[in-house]
Regions:
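Alpha-helical adaptor scaffolds
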Residues: 46, 80-87, 118, 184-212, ...
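Acidic, Ser/Thr-rich low-complexity linear motifs
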Residues: 53, 178-183, 253-260
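Solenoid-like repeat scaffolds
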Residues: 104, 135-140, 174-179, 209-215, ...
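Terminal, low-structured helical/coil segments at or just beyond the last alpha-helical repeat
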Residues: 253-282
């Protein structure tokens, strides 16, 4: 299960599917193994979040998160996993209750803070989101929490504070990629951080690297769209965003709050594209 959970912290479809397969085997050996149920819930939920057209993943996550809580009602990880599923189901109030319970049980529980930060960002509550991403990063170094903390500050209009956090996010992404050189999501967040810091050519290089690693990944396409939008390459940005949505990216609330896409907001093609997107994943 530990090995499987190492894979579900990555976002490539193949890695997530491999992780889920390993965890399912652990459940077959011991159906009462609560940690395995938590791992299955997280992994299936991540598959649904990043690949929204995938059938059956959210249903599996729902079943596994419920079973994990039945087995370990005082497990912070089980409550966080349940909150994750509720978040993807659009049950925001219930999700927040689950995350709050997870944080009460474990002051250093990462996922509850990170995912609640995602909810707050989508709601436009950027200061709360920034604080939650900071707390998540204090619980465990994570390039996504660091990057989204910088983004939340950008959305607040705190340019200098955002720049300092992009520098920190870049360092975290670099350390992560020293150990995981084939992580395309980290490569795209590294690329956008570089662009935000004025290092445009380096940013483009890392965006190209991400596309080489996994050209079909929805999250990679989305973040490359962000990079093009930052460079005022509007049509290329919208092309990439269109490809991301076709590949399964389906989070309208996130797209509308993302400061990296601000230059696209008045474009009719962008508005038409976003109006047809739904879901909770990003």
């Amino acid at each position: 299960v530990l090995r499987g959970r190492q894979f579900f912290h990555r976002t490539r479809k193949a890695s997530l599917e491999f992780a889920l397969e390993m965890i399912r085997k652990a459940i077959e050996v011991d159906p009462e193994y609560a940690e395995a149920r938590v791992g299955a819930a997280y992994t299936a939920a991540l598959l649904r979040m990043y690949y929204s057209t995938l059938e059956g993943a959210l249903e599996e996550a729902d079943v596994e998160s419920r079973r994990a809580l039945e087995l370990e009602p005082d497990s912070s990880d089980a409550h966080a996993a349940r909150g994750f599923v509720l978040f993807l189901q659009g049950e925001m109030e219930a999700a927040e209750e689950s995350f709050s319970r997870a944080m009460q049980l474990d002051p250093l529980q990462f996922e509850s803070r990170y995912l609640l930060g995602r909810i707050r960002f989508q709601q436009g509550r950027h200061l709360e989101a920034a604080n939650l991403f900071d707390e998540a990063g204090s619980a465990r170094e994570d390039y996504q929490a660091a990057f989204f903390g910088a983004q939340a500050r950008e959305a607040l209009g705190s340019a200098e504070d955002a720049k300092a956090h992009y520098r920190a996010a870049l360092e975290v992404a670099e350390r992560h990629m020293d150990l995981n050189p084939d992580d395309p999501r980290a490569a795209t967040m590294r690329a956008v951080s570089l662009c935000r810091l004025g290092r445009l050519e380096e940013g483009k290089e890392w965006a190209e690297r991400a596309l080489e690693i996994d050209p079909a990944d929805a999250g990679v396409r989305y973040n490359v769209a962000c990079l093009f939008a930052l460079e005022q390459e509007t049509e290329r940005a919208i092309d990439c965003l269109e490809e991301a949505i076709a590949a399964g990216f389906g989070n309208r609330a996130w797209i509308r709050q993302d400061p990296d896409l601000a230059s696209l907001k008045d474009n009719p093609r962008f508005e038409e594209l976003v109006s047809g997107v739904g879901g909770a994943g990003c």
